[in-house]
Swiss-Prot record:
One of its GO terms (cellular component) is cytoplasm. GTP binds at Q11, E71, S140, G144, T145, G146, N206, N228. Tubulin is the major constituent of microtubules, a cylinder consisting of laterally associated linear protofilaments composed of alpha- and beta-tubulin heterodimers. Microtubules grow by the addition of GTP-tubulin dimers to the microtubule end, where a stabilizing cap forms. Below the cap, tubulin dimers are in GDP-bound state, owing to GTPase activity of alpha-tubulin. It is found in: Cytoplasm, Cytoskeleton. Residues 431-450 have a biased composition (Acidic residues). Pfam families: Tubulin, Tubulin_C. Disulfide bonds: none annotated. SUPFAM superfamilies: Tubulin C-terminal domain-like, Tubulin nucleotide-binding domain-like. CDD domains: beta_tubulin. This is Tubulin beta-6 chain. Dimer of alpha and beta chains. A typical microtubule is a hollow water-filled tube with an outer diameter of 25 nm and an inner diameter of 15 nM. Alpha-beta heterodimers associate head-to-tail to form protofilaments running lengthwise along the microtubule wall with the beta-tubulin subunit facing the microtubule plus end conferring a structural polarity. Microtubules usually have 13 protofilaments but different protofilament numbers can be found in some organisms and specialized cells. GO terms for molecular function: GTP binding; GTPase activity; metal ion binding; structural constituent of cytoskeleton.
Length: 450
């Protein structure tokens, strides 16, 4: 079937990734040892379990996951965590040195030494697939390993499997919550790579996730566990159509075809409804209108950009649970008609919806939202400003040049990011003037006919 190969890199990527596997194991009825003990009544859980799992001897299911890091700490905690025993031991690839939040170490020195070991595991997993659909990579862009080594791996996989989909779940540096001083450097260098080598990037950031935890879930002290719970719900929603039967299916390629009008503009905002905290899931059952209303709400977006400040080029909604497709279509049309100014008018019907019959554990219905909005430029713009402020003074540059990088690379990354912002802006504005010219011509035609 259409397999997906999952790669997680760096501390952030590994923590999100292991949370994701907890959710997927739960949905497919796989216990922490890899044994299936779901509801025996139906084969739905097993029917397409091969999207994410290999079947090993003795009927055990093993995640098709590659775990990489430049230091052993996070790996050790995954191994001793709730699902540590389910992964294939050979698929843990780690160094001892760490990348020290330095993109150059992850991309050029330490990471480059480890990358062949990672690629061997990736190859082995890919060769076992019947029909590999693509890769999903979890990483952050602010550190050293996820950003530097993550993008190195993405470009190597791109070389070897040019026709497979490459999807990333990338955690961007947050505006207010900064983890390291050199985040703007690492993020800009990473985006420079992602623009060229990834097919679809789901943009996440911690601040937006914190806001959801405070505002919507009323958690007073959210932990990374709570944040990762939100992310993993979204990740599971994006691929549910592949794993469970549905009325309108979607896969990574269909998603890309429907969401990406121009190849460089593949950075998506994601949202999820209903937003629930880890403890309170069993009490929620929303109707289709409620799901729709929640999922288009700016407060539900998992990255710090406000869709009301831009326009949607395209969007995709994935509903889960027993519901009428007619109602889904009506609600989606309703959103577009009521908020038509927030959608570009030169792509008609730019919202795609899909429906999967099996809801996530503990909910009757849910929906995942993926939007390609021009307002995402706010995030790039913010990082770019911070980058420029430091780069102008050449602050912290010696850490990068010391690993063999050239200043030229920084300049290129900076201008690539600024080009990206300009492209988003261009398509955000590409409406009124073009429309007016067009209407003017039409007016002439009418006069001409009379």
């Amino acid at each position: 079937m259409r397999e997906i190969l999952h790669v997680q890199g760096g501390q952030c990527g590994n923590q999100i990734g292991s949370k994701f596997w907890e959710v997927i194991c739960d949905e497919h009825g796989v216990d922490p040892t890899g044994k299936y003990n779901g509801d025996g009544s139906s084969d739905i859980q097993l029917e397409r379990i091969d999207v994410y799992y290999n079947e090993a001897s003795g009927g055990r299911y093993v995640p098709r996951a590659v775990l990489m890091d430049l230091e052993p700490g996070t790996m050790d905690s995954i191994r001793s965590g709730p699902i540590g025993q389910i992964f294939r031991p050979d698929n843990f690839v780690f160094g001892q040195s760490g990348a020290g939040n330095n993109w150059a170490k992850g991309h050029y020195t330490e990471g480059a030494e480890l990358i062949d070991a990672v690629l061997d595991v990736v190859r082995k997993e890919a060769e076992n697939c019947d029909c590999l659909q693509g890769f999903q990579v979890c990483h952050s862009l602010g550190g050293g390993t996820g950003s530097g080594m993550g993008t190195l791996l993405i470009s190597k996989i791109r070389e070897e499997y040019p026709d497979r989909m490459m999807m990333t779940f990338s955690v961007f540096p947050s505006p207010k919550v900064s983890d390291t001083v050199v985040e703007p450097y690492n993020a800009t260098l990473s985006v420079h790579q992602l623009v060229e080598n990834a097919d679809e990037c789901m943009v996440l950031d911690n601040e937006a996730l914190y806001d959801i935890c405070f505002r919507t879930l009323k958690l007073t002290t959210p932990s990374f566990g709570d944040l990762n719970h939100l992310i993993s719900a979204t990740m599971s929603g994006v691929t549910c159509c592949l794993r469970f039967p549905g009325q309108l299916n979607s896969d990574l390629r269909k998603l890309a075809v429907n969401l990406i009008p121009f190849p460089r503009l593949h950075f998506f905002m994601v949202g999820f409804a209903p937003l629930t905290s880890r403890g309170s899931q069993q009490y929620v059952s929303l109707t289709v209108p409620e799901l729709t209303q929640q999922m288009w709400d700016a407060k539900n977006m998992m990255c710090a950009a406000d869709p009301r400040h831009g326009r949607y080029l395209t969007a995709s909604a994935m509903f889960r649970g027993k519901m009428s497709t007619k109602e889904v279509d009506e609600q989606m049309m309703n959103v577009q008609n009521k908020n038509s100014s927030y959608f570009v008018e030169w792509i008609p019907n730019n919202v795609k919806s899909s429906v999967c019959d099996i809801p996530p554990r503990g909910l009757k219905t849910s929906s995942t939202f993926i939007g390609n909005s021009t307002s995402i430029q706010e995030m790039f713009r913010r990082v770019s400003e911070q980058f420029t402020a430091m780069f102008r003074r050449k602050a912290f540059l010696h850490w990068y040049t010391g690993e063999g990088m050239d200043e030229m690379e920084f300049t290129e990354a900076e201008s690539n990011m600024n080009d990206l912002v300009a492209e988003y802006q261009q398509y955000q504005d590409a409406t009124v003037e073009d429309e007016e010219e067009y209407e003017g011509e039409e007016g002439l035609d009418e006069n001409y006919e009379t």
